[in-house]
Design a protein with these regions (language model features):
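Mixed-charge, glycine-accented linear interaction segment located at domain edges/termini
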Residues: 102-155
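A generic structural signal for solvent-exposed, polar alpha-helical segments
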Residues: 17, 38-40, 92-93, 106, ...
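Extracellular/virion structural assembly segments
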Residues: 38-101, 132-137, 141
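Solvent-exposed edge beta-strands and adjacent loop segments
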Residues: 1-55, 59-60, 103-118
Length: 155
C-alpha cells in the first residue's frame, strides 16, 4: 500500500498481523436480444468490482495498520490509495505485479473480548485500471517500476 503520494510513494506491505485474505469479484452482464437470434440473448460483461479483504490481529506500530485504523477510519477523505499486488517468487527482471488505485473500507477495528487479541478486518476495492510492473525490495525500501509495453508489432 502506498502511504505516500503518487509523486513520492512510500510502499509498505499489507502483511503484518494479517492471517487471511479473500478476493471477491462481482460482475454484472447486459443481455441483448435480436430477432435474428430468435430471442436468445447475447451477453456482455458490463461492470466488475474487485475487493480484497484482509483479516488478522491489530499490530499497533505497523505503518499500514496505523494508517488504516488511525487515519483512514476517522477521515473518509483519506480512503483513496494505491495498491501493488506482486509475487516475490518471480525471477528478477520480469514483471511481477500490478499497481492500481483503490479505496479502503474498515469492517472491524479490533474490538472484542478482553482476553483475546484484537481481531481486525479491512478491505481494498479496485477503482481503476491496473498497470503492470516490477516491485523490488532493496536497501530496506520497496520500489515500483512500470513495465515497458511488451507488445511489439512487427510488420
Amino acid at each position: 500500500m502506498n502511504l505516500g503520494t503518487p509523486e513520492e510513494p512510500d510502499w509498505k506491505p499489507i502483511t503484518v498481523g494479517i492471517s487471511t485474505t479473500e478476493t471477491e469479484i462481482e460482475e454484472e452482464a447486459e443481455d441483448y436480444y435480436y430477432m435474428d437470434g430468435r430471442g436468445t440473448p447475447e451477453s456482455e460483461p458490463a461492470t466488475q468490482k474487485i475487493t480484497r479483504t484482509f483479516t488478522g490481529h491489530r499490530k499497533i506500530g505497523d505503518p499500514v495498520q496505523d494508517m488504516v485504523f488511525d487515519m483512514m477510519m476517522e477521515n473518509l477523505d483519506k480512503r483513496a490509495t494505491e495498491i501493488v499486488e506482486y509475487y516475490d517468487i518471480i525471477p528478477s527482471g520480469t514483471p511481477n505485479g500490478k499497481k492500481y488505485p483503490a479505496t479502503v473500507a474498515v469492517q472491524n477495528d479490533g474490538s472484542g473480548e478482553a482476553q483475546m487479541r484484537a481481531d481486525i478486518s479491512f478491505s481494498i476495492t479496485k477503482t481503476g485500471a491496473s498497470e503492470k510492473g516490477t516491485m523490488t525490495f532493496t536497501q530496506n525500501k520497496y520500489t515500483w517500476a512500470k513495465s515497458e509495453d511488451l507488445r511489439k508489432v512487427t510488420v
